[in-house]
Amino acid sequence: MAEPLALRSPDPQQEPPAWQPLNSHHRLVNELWRLGQVHAAWEAWQAQADPAVPPPPEERLAEGRLRLAVGDTWMGLDQLWWLSLRWRNPSCHQRTLLHRSQFPRLFEAEIQTAAEQAGVQANLLRAIAKQESRFAPGVVSPAGAVGVMQLMPSTATEMADAPTSTLMLKDPADNFELGARYLNHLLEQWESDPFRSIASYNAGPGAVASWAQPTDQDDDALWVERIPYPETRFYTKKVLDNLLGYLGGNQSFCNETGAGMGQKRAGDDASDHDQTHQKQADPGGGQNTDADEIEPGQQHG
């Protein structure tokens, strides 16, 4: 196998994302955003929006960023994802901002604390939380997985070595802490192999153990393509894609002349979005849902 991603080493040093103006068409909204009054900016944007007139792409970008800022991560990330597929000929600055907005750094204190305590990379927690719940703390899946890391209650209780509750698991700090412990457990089980660890988070380690295991001659990507569960194969690709997005940090899509450069990443097309409805049952003790399968109405479940 190729050299594995070092998901248990400290995160690479990254500059925090620089503040960016909203660039809405509405002056009041822009000013409130500049002042850090994001909830007031969102209310002002809603008051000025005309539902009868479809907003242009740059205004949809502003709306998606506003939704993320006020905690509507479910709709915000969904809107930004669709915009990334449909926006024709954005400027390089718009393309860069759209890409970065799809990898928000939310719950930073909770994630950093959980990652340091468990000995896993914070970027891995971000990558999984984005796919599992879109960072929505109140999400409860039809199978009963709860919170930002979509922990099954039985897994959470095992990691806590004490009884847990749905209310507790809806708290981001507790959920990230227990989710990070579970990730560390999987990484230990699979000798720090990121591919089997990520697949196990979705399908359960028992299922992954039953599959053909990679050898020294195998290419990592080839092993992922051979995952027999379509949903887990898709899930693993998306989490790795998220991880690369977060590791990219302040990546720019402008070349030296300022011209736009391509943004589309592996897995970012409509057919991949539809694949999330082909969910396999979780045969193990791990999480068994991802963000694209949970109905929006469930995020406060």
Describe the role of every protein-language-model region.
Residues 21-40, 44-47:
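Alpha-helical segment of the N-proximal tetratricopeptide repeat
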Residues 1, 12-17, 28, 48-260:
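Catalytic glycan-binding domains that act on GlcNAc-containing polysaccharides
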Residues 2-23, 34:
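N-terminal leader/linker segments that initiate helical-solenoid repeat arrays
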Residues 255-301:
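Short, strongly patterned local motifs
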